[in-house]
Amino acid sequence: MDERLFLQLAAISEEERRLMAGEAIDEVTYFASGRVADADKLLADREVRVRTHTRFADFHSHNYIEMVYMASGSTTHIVGEEKLVIREGDLLLLNRRATHRVLRADEGDVAVNILVRPSFFNSLLSVIGRDEPLTDFLL
């Protein structure tokens, strides 16, 4: 990975600084109701958004598909009741119904989040069909 890109991705964000200091996440920025992260707030008018993955996030779910690509190091995710460790090069795919959290990670543990509205997959559905297990998982 390009060193400049890595340094940019690895930098601790203001959001992460606040979480590390014990502050609560800014729910107005992320959630429409309860602990459900909202696509309209995070994706605005886009179908797909790529952003640095927050290294420490409490239990939540979302109304979009989340893909987490581990660019460097590793992170531990609790998905439902299952503990998953993803390592450099791994991709974690979470559907809209997944409730999960990310355990605290180090500065060198860098992941990229790819947030996708379910409507993005409409063209894919015409190819694979609606009665497939992948369709059930994604939507």
Regions found by a protein language model. Name each.
Residues 1-74, 129-137:
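Generic protein-terminus/edge-of-domain signal
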Residues 46-136:
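N-terminal regulatory/effector-sensing and dimerization cores
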